[in-house]
UniProtKB/Swiss-Prot annotation:
Protein name: Arabinose operon regulatory protein
Binding-site list for alpha-L-arabinopyanose: 8, 24, 38, 82, 93
Transmembrane segments: none
DNA-binding region: 198-219, 246-269
Lineage, broadest ranks: Bacteria, Pseudomonadati, Pseudomonadota, Gammaproteobacteria, Enterobacterales
Coiled coil: none
Amino acid sequence: MAEAQNDPLLPGYSFNAHLVAGLTPIEANGYLDFFIDRPLGMKGYILNLTIRGQGVVKNQGREFVCRPGDILLFPPGEIHHYGRHPEAREWYHQWVYFRPRAYWHEWLNWPSIFANTGFFRPDEAHQPHFSDLFGQIINAGQGEGRYSELLAINLLEQLLLRRMEAINESLHPPMDNRVREACQYISDHLADSNFDIASVAQHVCLSPSRLSHLFRQQLGISVLSWREDQRISQAKLLLSTTRMPIATVGRNVGFDDQLYFSRVFKKCTGASPSEFRAGCEEKVNDVAVKLS
């Protein structure tokens, strides 16, 4: 009977575990310098991060060159045919074999380079963090402690979530600090009936045209439209939570003329200030009756 292979870097290892992780340091003509060839793939997933040199992944006549920072995801049943690129002196890659938790499904839906082989490349700022997480997973996965495997799985979950977070940031980049400061300035000056864009632009050291462009680019609406939304929101809050006279509410949000305030409020909400307040009071009374 053949002796079981205990080295996960060599052919024949069973990978009969929830998580196995390691580093494969392939040097030209070294003992690990051969192509992995699993035409039927594996039962679990494998994540592969290139950290040095170059590797090449082959799949039915197509090839992909792995460079430092590239992360590949091989799902169950996907062809595994990869090794050191023939023109590279080395290919060092960290890897994690795992069987996922059921709720990870969405996090494992990666864009593919071909067939079902997933690909993700963090931007330069995030690459050290992903490499560090891989290292922590490997250390925990190779540990002998009672909770080592659970810790490794927890770190892997963090890595998958970090990828989701990085993708979300790329789709929704953080707000420009100048736009954020402009929003704060506008919110602090809602009662200013002499408001103009120039004063906001001066506060954040931009020209009015540049501020208007950035505002629309980041928030999708104009400065004046955003301010009006804030004024109406604040007016609704004051009408629903205080007994402040309607004229005073209007002045608190920059309307000196009560009739004009009422017109604008009704246009935005479909109800006059007095109707809106009455509706809020009715809802409060209904809740009080139900609780009594």
